[in-house]
A protein has these predicted regions:
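Non-catalytic DNA-recognition/assembly elements of restriction-modification systems
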Residues: 3, 7-31
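Conserved secondary-structure micro-motifs at functional edges
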Residues: 41-43
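A short beta-sheet element
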Residues: 48, 70-135
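A cross-kingdom feature marking solvent-exposed beta-strand/loop segments within repeated
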Residues: 1-11, 57-71, 94, 100-102, ...
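Sequence-specific dsDNA recognition surfaces
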Residues: 22-35, 50-82
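Basic, amphipathic alpha-helical recognition segments used for DNA target recognition
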Residues: 20-28, 38, 53-54, 58-59, ...
Length: 146
C-alpha cells in the first residue's frame, strides 16, 4: 500500500471522488486574429508566453501591450485563472503553469501560444494554492505523459 492509499483509507473512509478539469471548469484560448502590428503601441496589457513559463504567479508589472478593438471579442484573464504554455521545444517544458493571484480592474489578455483554465466555482481552490498545485512535480509528471 502506498502512502497516498494509506492516507485515503485513514482520512477518507468513503473513498475519494476524482473529477477531470473539464468537470470543474472551462478551458479558453489566448489572443486570436492578431498581426505583428497589433503589438505596437497597444491599448491593453497582454500576458506573454515567458510570463506564464517563468512565474508561478503572473507578473502584472509588465509593459507588454496589444491593440484591442472596442467591439473585439477576445478572452480575458480573471482572478484565479490557471494559465498553461501550450507547446515548447522539449516535453519537459510543455504545460508550465501560472496563476492570476491578484484582483485587478485592468483587462488582461493571454498570448496565442498559451491557454487558460477557469474554475466554475471560484472558491473551490484558492489561487494561492493552485499556483503550487499546478506546478507540482506530481502534476507536471501527468502533463508530460500526454
Amino acid at each position: 500500500m502506498t502512502e497516498l492509499e494509506r492516507l485515503i483509507e485513514e482520512y477518507c473512509s468513503n473513498g475519494v471522488e476524482y473529477k477531470t478539469l473539464g468537470e470543474l471548469g472551462t478551458f479558453y484560448g489566448g489572443l486570436s486574429g492578431k498581426s505583428k502590428d497589433d503589438f505596437v503601441d497597444g491599448n491593453a496589457k497582454f500576458i506573454t508566453y515567458m510570463n506564464v513559463f517563468s512565474n508561478i504567479e503572473l507578473n502584472l508589472d509588465t509593459k507588454d501591450t496589444v491593440q484591442i478593438g472596442e467591439n473585439e471579442k477576445q478572452n480575458t484573464i480573471e482572478y484565479g485563472d490557471v494559465l498553461f504554455t501550450g507547446s515548447s521545444e522539449t516535453p519537459d517544458e510543455c504545460g508550465m503553469s501560472s496563476v492570476l493571484t491578484k484582483h485587478t480592474e485592468e483587462k488582461l489578455y493571454l498570448n496565442s501560444f498559451c491557454f487558460g483554465f477557469r474554475f466554475y466555482d471560484k472558491e473551490l481552490i484558492l489561487p494561492g494554492f493552485s499556483k503550487y498545485l499546478f506546478r507540482s512535480e506530481a502534476l507536471r509528471k501527468q502533463i508530460k505523459k500526454t
